[in-house]
Amino acid sequence: MKRELKVLIGLACLFVIGLPVFAQPNSRSIETFVLDDFDSAGSQNYMYNGKTYNWDWEVGSSRFIADGYPKTGYFEGVPNSLKQLHKGEDKEFKVFGVKSAFKRKGDNWFEVYPTSDGKSFEIPFVGVVSQMDFWIWGAGYNYYLEVMVRDALGTVKVLPAGSLAFHGWKNIVINIPGWIKQSSHLRSGPENLTFVGFRIRTDAEEYVDNFVVYFDQIKYTSNSLSLIYDGYELNEVDFGDSSDSDEVSGGDAK
C-alpha cells in the first residue's frame, strides 16, 4: 500500500512540475527577412510598420580614391547555392558590384550604403535581430569587411565581418551582440536597430588598384514579436501636436 502511495505521489509531483512547461505561452516568433536580393534595382518593396520602402545603393570613399572611382552597377549573376533554391523559376538574377582603385596604399576604405531620394537611408530592422547573413564575392585581396548598424540610442556600431582574401562567392553570417541596444523606452528616440551599410578597408600593404566586389541577398533573422505588445497601435496616435514638436526644447524635455 505504501509503495502504491509513493508511486501516486511521484506521478502527482511530475504532473505539477511539468504543468507550467506545457501551459507557458511562447511570445517568440523567429522569422527571416530579406533586405535586398538585388534582382530588382530600387524595387525591394520592403515592409516595415505597414509601410513599403525602396532604395538605391551608393558608394562613398576615403580621400585617396582614384579619379573616376568607385564604379558601381548591377550585373547578371548569382551564387550557385541560391540558384538551386530557385531552380525552375523563370527569373533573371542580378548582383550589385563595386570596382575601386586608390592612388596609394594605406588606410583606404569605401562604404556601400542605401539611399532614398538622393539621401542616405537607414533600413529599419523588424523586431530584435539575432544575426545577419549575405553573399559576397571576393577577389583575393587582403581587404576587410565591416557591417555598420545604428542602435536604439542613435550610435553607429561597427561589426567586423572578416577578410575578403578569398575568390568567388562566400556566405557571411554575423551574430548581433546582445550588448547592442535594439529598442528604447523613449518615444522620441529611434524605434529599432537600423542597417547603415557596409565598409571595406584595405590592408596597408595590399595592392589598391583594380579591386572588385559583388553583393547578393542580404537577409536577417529576428524575433519579430519581441517589441509588439497589447495596445501597440496606440503608440502612434496623433494628439494634434505633431507640428509643434520642434518647439519643445530637447534639452529641457529629456
Cite the ranges covered by each PLM segment:
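Bacterial N-terminal signal peptides
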Residues: 9-18
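Bacterial N-terminal signal peptides that target proteins for export
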Residues: 1-9
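Beta-rich carbohydrate-recognition modules and glycan-binding surfaces
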Residues: 23-254
